[in-house]
Design a protein with these regions (language model features):
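N-terminal auxiliary interaction/assembly segments of multi-subunit proteins
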Residues: 1-70
Protein backbone atom coordinates (compact mmCIF):
# COMPACT_ATOMS: atom_id res chain seq x y z
CA UNK A 1 0.00 0.00 0.00
CA UNK A 2 0.91 3.66 0.05
CA UNK A 3 3.79 4.79 2.26
CA UNK A 4 3.16 7.86 4.44
CA UNK A 5 5.85 10.54 4.58
CA UNK A 6 5.82 13.30 7.20
CA UNK A 7 6.66 16.62 5.52
CA UNK A 8 7.93 19.56 7.56
CA UNK A 9 8.59 23.10 6.38
CA UNK A 10 11.17 24.73 8.66
CA UNK A 11 11.31 28.51 8.61
CA UNK A 12 14.04 29.05 11.21
CA UNK A 13 15.91 27.31 14.01
CA UNK A 14 17.14 29.10 17.12
CA UNK A 15 19.03 27.82 20.15
CA UNK A 16 17.94 29.24 23.49
CA UNK A 17 18.89 28.49 27.06
CA UNK A 18 16.48 26.64 29.31
CA UNK A 19 16.07 29.85 31.32
CA UNK A 20 15.14 31.78 28.17
CA UNK A 21 12.63 29.09 27.22
CA UNK A 22 11.07 29.12 30.69
CA UNK A 23 10.78 32.93 30.54
CA UNK A 24 8.74 32.84 27.32
CA UNK A 25 5.08 33.56 27.72
CA UNK A 26 1.92 33.46 25.65
CA UNK A 27 1.66 36.13 22.97
CA UNK A 28 5.39 36.87 23.21
CA UNK A 29 6.88 37.78 19.84
CA UNK A 30 10.00 35.96 18.70
CA UNK A 31 12.03 37.74 16.05
CA UNK A 32 13.24 36.00 12.90
CA UNK A 33 16.20 37.02 10.78
CA UNK A 34 15.58 39.27 7.81
CA UNK A 35 14.47 37.25 4.78
CA UNK A 36 13.91 34.04 6.79
CA UNK A 37 10.89 33.39 4.56
CA UNK A 38 13.23 33.05 1.57
CA UNK A 39 14.96 29.94 2.92
CA UNK A 40 12.42 27.37 4.09
CA UNK A 41 13.89 23.90 4.62
CA UNK A 42 11.75 21.06 3.25
CA UNK A 43 12.15 17.96 5.42
CA UNK A 44 10.72 14.44 5.02
CA UNK A 45 10.83 12.13 8.02
CA UNK A 46 13.54 14.35 9.54
CA UNK A 47 15.76 14.36 6.43
CA UNK A 48 16.50 17.58 4.53
CA UNK A 49 15.19 17.17 0.97
CA UNK A 50 15.37 20.68 -0.39
CA UNK A 51 14.53 24.30 0.17
CA UNK A 52 12.00 26.83 -0.93
CA UNK A 53 10.34 30.14 -0.21
CA UNK A 54 7.27 30.99 1.84
CA UNK A 55 4.69 32.58 -0.50
CA UNK A 56 1.17 33.98 -0.29
CA UNK A 57 -1.36 31.92 -2.30
CA UNK A 58 -4.64 33.83 -2.36
CA UNK A 59 -5.94 33.40 1.22
CA UNK A 60 -3.36 30.89 2.38
CA UNK A 61 0.39 30.35 2.67
CA UNK A 62 2.47 27.94 0.62
CA UNK A 63 6.06 26.95 -0.07
CA UNK A 64 7.48 27.42 -3.56
CA UNK A 65 10.15 24.77 -4.13
CA UNK A 66 13.47 26.23 -5.26
CA UNK A 67 15.79 23.22 -5.05
CA UNK A 68 15.73 19.48 -4.40
CA UNK A 69 18.92 18.09 -2.89
CA UNK A 70 20.33 14.91 -4.37
Amino acid sequence: GPVDVKLEFVLYRKNVTLAELEAMGQQQLLSLPTNAELNVEIMANGVLLGNGELVQMNDTLGVEIHEWLS
